[in-house]
Amino acid sequence: MTEVQAMVEFSVELNKFYNVDLFQRGFYQIRASMKIPSRIPHRVEASLLHATGMTLAFPASVHDSLICSKTFQILYKNEEVVLNDVMIFKVKMLLDERKIEETLEEMNFLLSLDLHFTDGDYSADDLNALQLISSRTLKLHFSPHRGLHHHVNVMFDYFHLSVVSVTVHASLVALHQPLISFPRPVKTTWLNRNAPAQNKDSVIPTLESVVFGINYTKQLSPDGCSFIIADSFLHHAYRFHYTLCATLLLAFKGLHSYFITVTEEIPSCQKLELEEMDVEARLTELCEEVKKIENPDELAELINMNLAQLCSLLMALWGQFLEVITLHEELRILLAQEHHTLRVRRFSEAFFCFEHPREAAIAYQELHAQSHLQMCTAIKNTSFCSSLPPLPIECSELDGDLNSLPIIFEDRYLDSVTEDLDAPWMGIQNLQRSESSKMDKYETEESSVAGLSSPELKVRPAGASSIWYTEGEKQLTKSLKGKNEESNKSKVKVTKLMKTMKSENTKKLIKQNSKDSVVLVGYKCLKSTASNDLIKCFEGNPSHSQKEGLDPTICGYNFDPKTYMRQTSQKEASCLPTNTERTEQKSPDIENVQPDQFDPLNSGNLNLCANLSISGKLDISQDDSEITQMEHNLASRRSSDDCHDHQTTPSLGVRTIEIKPSNKDPFSGENITVKLGPWTELRQEEILVDNLLPNFESLESNGKSKSIEITFEKEALQEAKCLSIGESLTKLRSNLPAPSTKEYHVVVSGDTIKLPDISATYASSRFSDSGVESEPSSFATHPNTDLVFETVQGQGPCNSERLFPQLLMKPDYNVKFSLGNHCTESTSAISEIQSSLTSINSLPSDDELSPDENSKKSVVPECHLNDSKTVLNLGTTDLPKCDDTKKSSITLQQQSVVFSGNLDNETVAIHSLNSSIKDPLQFVFSDEETSSDVKSSCSSKPNLDTMCKGFQSPDKSNNSTGTAITLNSKLICLGTPCVISGSISSNTDVSEDRTMKKNSDVLNLTQMYSEIPTVESETHLGTSDPFSASTDIVKQGLVENYFGSQSSTDISDTCAVSYSNALSPQKETSEKEISNLQQEQDKEDEEEEQDQQMVQNGYYEETDYSALDGTINAHYTSRDELMEERLTKSEKINSDYLRDGINMPTVCTSGCLSFPSAPRESPCNVKYSSKSKFDAITKQPSSTSYNFTSSISWYESSPKPQIQAFLQAKEELKLLKLPGFMYSEVPLLASSVPYFSVEEEDGSEDGVHLIVCVHGLDGNSADLRLVKTYIELGLPGGRIDFLMSERNQNDTFADFDSMTDRLLDEIIQYIQIYSLTVSKISFIGHSLGNLIIRSVLTRPRFKYYLNKLHTFLSLSGPHLGTLYNSSALVNTGLWFMQKWKKSGSLLQLTCRDHSDPRQTFLYKLSNKAGLHYFKNVVLVGSLQDRYVPYHSARIEMCKTALKDKQSGQIYSEMIHNLLRPVLQSKDCNLVRYNVINALPNTADSLIGRAAHIAVLDSEIFLEKFFLVAALKYFQ
């Protein structure tokens, strides 16, 4: 082994020291040292670059390899001390020349920062005068090619709360023969194992032995006049020279490029004339010179000289770099922002969010709690936690690791969510059972079940999207088979669920898409409808959706009612209480949905396809109004087109076809042939409603489920006349909730269609194939009221998303899903929006493999940075974005997508060539590629890059100006592959710089428009959403993306996949597809029958079906959005973003493996808004805007092996099919501003936000110290004042009334003494303190402040007492304490302070108004906490209370008393958290105390909790 000497130089800048909350005044000093593993022979040299600034108490100094900072004195609270000490550490080491780069990348460079202190006399010469009080060790992850350039804030421990900001730059500066001797540790044996450590210096080798190898010996030539070199030694020399020169040149290139980037991005940075070097040419030149030398001595000298020259160049560049960037404030700010974003992103992993209908908050959800523990166990059994990549500068005490990072579950209860798609996860065993079924269908099932409806893009990590399954791609070819298997899966899951529940409870279960059993406490229970009814509904619904949903995109197809999503029987829906509407949404929607209503196309196209109205879902309004009987909606649809406000589920007004029950199959109806008329083409500016509205022959809304076989013939489509726009509009006008505030007027044939405002509650969330929820795209979800469309007839706002989803979904799934989707669609609008955002990013990076053998080759997912750098090229990763579900394959085998550069004129032609069920839609998006180039463009990086760019910048001026996208898609097959041919025209005023700069690439809309009739035209936009148009709409937030959850053909899934087959004319494709569709329909029918049996049992999972993807005409804010929409069909853009017309950064969805689709270095302006213009959670207007410069793929700078391992782990996680979504897929998190980055503005006129922190039993005012610290750090610049209550700390065993009086006096006195102008008041309570806070709210003296209440953060608060605590040990201890202390508070907690339970303190407190005055009610509990029962902390029903015949009713009444006002208040947002801490095996953990206090003293939990989600509650 030949060893070479390497030198890595580190520049460590200590910028500022912040006194966060130090207890003692005195002198402080920071000492830094560098360490590397002793197994590597090394020497460390330390020096100070130059003394700068004031010397403070004493100047900085160097002691051997230890550097001491300036010694400074701390006297005041929140004091900041400028250090500006620049320390240089030169690490010289011996490395194996064969493994130089690998060794450097894997080496642990450890930077130790020690805080020393003294409060006495101090002399700079005496190092021992200062005592060590706290220490942090930073692990520096160095790359020989990129170096290291990072900034971190290092916080010392809880007892010495202070922060030092550190900037680190590092580079490889030298590689050459060993010039000095290095001490080598002597290996110890068992004989001398106790001997003191010994070192011996290494021998300095000769130059020849280094260059030619250790065994080299000189050999004379035969003539004796010269020396000769054996070939082996000569090859060693060449390899040695090449390796070292290449490493040095790459290090030079990396440092040079970073230097250039810094000088360009920071205007004030000194500009230097840096020498450009062609690395490859220089390397080739050096190698050629060496090969010309024959004399061994000359060869060794030349190699040594070349290395010396390169080292000198590198050292000179490093010196220039340090001279320019050292202590550069703007660079420090830039690096701080980057580190903060990466850190928050890392925290967002394993932070799950579930969205539920608002009414579900009162439901009994024991299964949810159990599933959280099962999910944690399953996650820890995977490699996900252990493979979590570290940050570039890592501190495990601050950033967490496998043994310290908690897993957090968030439950949101949103008006926009009408169906509980996030069913409890019943464990791996269920998954394994369903594994027998095809992944494709399973994925769709999961996605629909999980229904990512988060304001943020929901990428269902576990289960969500088909794209995660590499196996799915292989299965695409077996799509038909997969469908049946998947249906089996869902049945298995449902069956398992049923088994887990007791029969008595099952009766109470509301049939939900989510599969989870929910018992509504105090609400009327739904009766399970007969299986026949359910089946009928499903069958009927499919037909509607197909009919109308197809409209623009559906040319013709046969579909069987079975293909439609199952719907609960109309009876069932009618039985539902209005309050339960959301919970049940699924069934009601189904019922309400007539064949046309469920049509995702109709609803989705809402303006686009009036036909697609989803009666059930659309009707749902943001307010709590429930879906009324579907039958009523159906009827109302026809009869009351004008009923805008109708709170009943808006029915789109689609005609229904009456289908008689089939004699053959009890679950299906007779086949009916429906011919759709051609759609009329509207002006580009107008939304083509005609296209959206297919002409259906008679539809009867008798509520009977019927299967309709719709055969679309190419000629029929072209020739048939479409219904008048008015009729279609009438269909659309389902009764929509009045709530929508803003409306888009879409002119269709002179008629206006209003899209529902975001206020509408129906936001549909779906899993896109990529695993991202598509829900964000739903109109209802869109926060921007502007995006809302009103149906012309005064129908309520319709969710175009809902209308479109089916079309968007894979055809097979579409049919089924169309109904099911509607059911599942309702999810929070916010989440939907976010999902769409995420999906956008993922689109470019997501590569899909078509099931076709043609598309077998996998596309390498790459995200291109703006600088055209590929962030990650992990090699080919197969992501079957299409669920590979053959069903859902709206398969356009040869579909290709071409994006044109300009949104305004761009037309997207969707041509489906041969749509085989097997083949998922594949889309190639490139600005430059023509249809002929499509194939290559999929894999080509430039195309991906351009695509990414286009998608990323959804029009920086996300003007609300809508673009009308006209899709004249001639063929859409529901239930089977859909072929869409047509063009999408988008009118957008938005200027799209980057995304679509090439007009030539895309056909003009007019051209496409004219070409639409001839599908054979060459450019195919192949938007897999059936159609990009719909996707685009979703992007805008006008329409919910249905494809997301259930359609495996989501664009995002299919994008980047190209078919090798040539495109075929529409005629051929339509005919072929029709036949294929019929075949698939038959198979789907079988599946439907099975599914319907499940429906009969009351456990139907809509997730099994994907809604059909449809083309949607919508106004798009920007063309980028359109493109993003298509690409990220699965991921939905946050409606908020769209709504606000904000530019949205592309976000990678899980489907894209977290590859940032947006160039990492190009910041995208993003406004943090949720569904509506209000923050998704806080409902407060979002005012935070910032540059989202960091890529979602926070781990992109990690070594490639680590990235691959982590991505593989994420895929494993996806296979678990976990419900909900992870915050890591959300584009914007709660914290975007680095610590200490904003100066506080004293001149603010808004007043002070007073946050009152109240401790618990036997606590003190310092208990919530860390909570206060992380809120202050996370919200720099805000006018926040903390009152750390101390009035009760001397006696927390008193009764609550006396403690309430003390706290109230303390608050009022604090405000008066400091003359505070209070604009907001928030409360944070721990344990018992939460009840004191609630009691204060009921006092007359506090009445004046009720209108200022903002957020109530309850940390493990016993709101329902300790009545049903499962820990006998804790119960005994509390009983003893109550007797010993004669504690009134403990007696009141057990509800034994009065003989009449309704006269106890807790019951009477629950009857008093209070919580609903807050904008946010945040309840944090933990299943590991045995001091306070989990259900009491989260105010929810527990299993024990249900069985208790005596106190159980009281318990239920308390829950209703507390939550009913909260749920009825539109301004009050309810969120619950379950924290699973990584606790050590100690006595505290055993008795449950560790988890109870972890919410106070776990820095990692608090930082993760606030940075990712909770800070927004205090903004």
Swiss-Prot record:
Any Pfam family matching the protein: DUF676
GO BP term, pick one: lipid metabolic process
Entry superkingdom: Eukaryota
Feature: compositional bias, Polar residues: 569-580
InterPro entries, per the entry: AB_hydrolase_fold, DUF3657, DUF676_lipase-like, Lipase-like
Tissue/organ expression: Ubiquitous.
Comp. bias regions, Acidic residues: 1082-1091
Annotated region (Disordered), positions in chain: 569-592, 1062-1093
PANTHER family given in the database record: LIPASE ROG1-RELATED-RELATED, PROTEIN FAM135A
Family affiliation: Belongs to the FAM135 family.
The name this protein goes by in its record: Protein FAM135A
Species whose genome carries this gene: Homo sapiens
